[in-house]
Curated annotation (Swiss-Prot):
Transcriptional coactivator; part of the gene cluster that mediates the biosynthesis of monodictyphenone, a prenyl xanthone derivative. With mdpE, coregulates the production of monodictyphenone. Residues 314-323 have a biased composition (Low complexity). Keywords: DNA-binding, Nucleus, Transcription, Transcription regulation. Disruption phenotype: Impairs the production of monodictyphenone and of any of the intermediates of the pathway. It is found in: Nucleus. Residues 107-126 bind DNA. GO terms for molecular function: DNA binding. It comes from Emericella nidulans (strain FGSC A4 / ATCC 38163 / CBS 112.46 / NRRL 194 / M139). Residues 77-147 form the HTH iclR-type domain. Transmembrane segments: none annotated. This is Monodictyphenone cluster transcriptional coactivator mdpA. Residues 289-298 have a biased composition (Pro residues). Residues 281-305, 314-333 are annotated as: Disordered. PANTHER family: MONODICTYPHENONE CLUSTER TRANSCRIPTIONAL COACTIVATOR MDPA, PUTATIVE (AFU_ORTHOLOGUE AFUA_4G14580)-RELATED.
Length: 479
């Protein structure tokens, strides 16, 4: 009991502190000037405000764990179940697009436009409004809220909902039957997904034939499972390497310029080469299902943050270098980060930069569309492409940024919940799983030559993220 009371006091203190931070960081607006669809914390808010926002949500989660009774728990599950069903219904009939982003509209008009019964629509709107999704400011009128409007302006959110409702939830509910029928099978066509969708084909082969799945799965992965790496930059900033003056850094398999720009601004004396997959070649790990390019983090927006646009512009204007696998473009258009160079490199190709001080290598995470054996093969190939460099350049360091499945209670509960969500999703869709830290280190132990091998010399991690930085050096054998 004393421990629980102590935790309650801690959560209360953290909540108060975070709320004060948001109040101090966010400009005050009167109710008349603030749009109904404008969120309290906008994407342009300071990093401190966004950190405080996450702290509040984390603290609320902790408070719920302390205070929730069995009845509360069941009620919450029932409400979430109905909310998901309502969102699927709204998405199926494209109702959200029928509601103007500003102002109100009669529910009757929306029902006629969407071709649905007005009584059904009214009841569903009133249910979702309890969660802040849509609003009924006056009886019989509907308007978008700050939570619902982005589902119109950013369709990927709706893709994630439809995938959750149409694929993930039905598959999850078939876990008991899958265990009864298939036991501990690892075959990708003997899964809860196969039973739920009554489909004998694997999820990977099915998604190859269905563009909708190709669109929905990455959206769900990014927005439904908190599959972000926004803590990597914070962890990298803890490295002593960046405080050693003028050093050369290569970021391999980057998804945006956010991280490089942040590091370049924090440490102006470093020079960073950002390597992305060549637009002419295959994607890093699955030609049919590339990893989604993540949007810039809040407050870090830049016209080159989306590498799809960047790739298209540089591919047509910059000649290939003498190396068959790369070509380079210097981002002179970025005055605040002029020490950044962009280079296209095919995954697992020989590393063309051999004299850098630091190599930051972003490796892929497991996916239902890529078997673990194939993933491991690509990871080993990428590591081996840097082995010779580390051997010939003893001062060079390789930094890996894996997101392993954490040990129980090793990270904050909501962070662990997201990791367990991804792990169970992989099992239900394809009998795949997240990789544990020991397995990552075991993979590294297989990267060697006749003179030495790669070893982990340091680990950096945080309770706020599942990402672990592995500092790798080449170690010669004792003869």
């Amino acid at each position: 009991m004393m421990s629980s009371l102590s935790d309650l006091e801690t959560h209360a203190s953290e909540l108060t502190s975070a709320v004060k931070t948001i109040i101090s960081q966010c400009p005050r607006q009167n109710a008349a000037s603030r749009s109904r669809t404008q969120p309290l914390i906008t994407s342009s808010a300071s990093k401190e405000a966004h950190r405080a926002q996450q702290s509040i949500l984390s603290t609320i989660s902790g408070l719920q764990k302390l205070l929730t009774s069995p009845t509360d728990f069941l009620h919450h599950l029932a409400v979430q179940n109905q909310l998901l069903a309502c969102l699927q219904w709204l998405g199926e009939f494209q109702v959200l697009a029928c509601i103007p982003l500003t102002g109100t509209v009669p529910i009757k008009d929306v029902a006629e436009l969407a071709g649905v019964p007005e009584t059904h629509l009214s009841r569903i709107i009133r249910m979702t409004a309890t969660a802040g999704f849509l609003d009924e400011p006056d009886p019989g009128q509907v308007a978008h809220s700050a939570l619902s409007a982005p589902f119109v302006t950013k369709p990927s959110y709706l893709d994630a909902v439809m995938f959750l409702a149409g694929t993930i939830a039905p598959s999850a509910l078939q876990m008991p039957t899958a265990t009864q029928r298939f036991g501990a099978s690892l075959r990708p066509n003997e899964t809860a997904y196969n039973l739920a969708l009554n489909n004998p084909a694997t999820f990977a082969s099915t998604s190859e034939q269905r563009p909708k799945l190709q669109r929905q799965w990455p959206a769900f992965l990014q927005y439904g499972t908190s599959d972000t790496d926004d803590r990597v930059t914070d962890l990298l900033s803890r490295l002593d390497h960046f405080r050693r003056g003028s050093i050369s850094v290569v970021e391999v398999s980057a998804r945006s310029l956010d991280r490089a720009t942040t590091l370049a601004n924090l440490y102006p004396s470093i020079n960073i080469t950002v390597q992305i997959a060549s637009p002419a070649g295959p994607t890093a790990w699955s030609p049919a299902h590339p990893n989604p390019i993540r949007p810039p983090t809040p407050g870090g927006s830049h016209k080159h943050d989306d590498l799809r646009a960047l790739t298209a512009s540089t591919a047509s204007t910059t000649p290939a270098s003498s190396h068959n696998h790369t070509h380079t473009h210097t981002t002179n258009s970025i005055p605040q980060a002029s020490n950044i160079t962009i280079q296209h490199r095919l995954p697992t190709a020989p590393q063309p930069i051999t004299s850098a001080n630091l190599y930051i290598l972003h490796l892929p995470s497991p996916s239902p569309t890529v078997p673990f054996a194939s993933l491991a093969t690509h990871i080993l190939a990428e590591l081996r492409s840097h082995l010779d460099i580390l051997r010939s350049n003893p001062s060079a360091t390789l930094i890996l940024t894996p997101r392993p499945l954490p040990e129980p209670s090793a990270v904050h509960s909501e962070v662990e919940a997201s990791a367990r969500l991804r792990d169970l999703t992989l099992m239900q869709l394809a009998n795949e799983r997240e990789i544990e830290l020991a397995e990552w280190i075991n993979l590294l132990s297989n990267v060697s030559d006749s003179m030495g091998r790669l070893v982990v010399v340091n680990k950096i991690q945080s309770r706020e993220s599942t990402v672990v930085l592995l500092e790798i050096r080449y170690q010669a054998y004792n003869r």
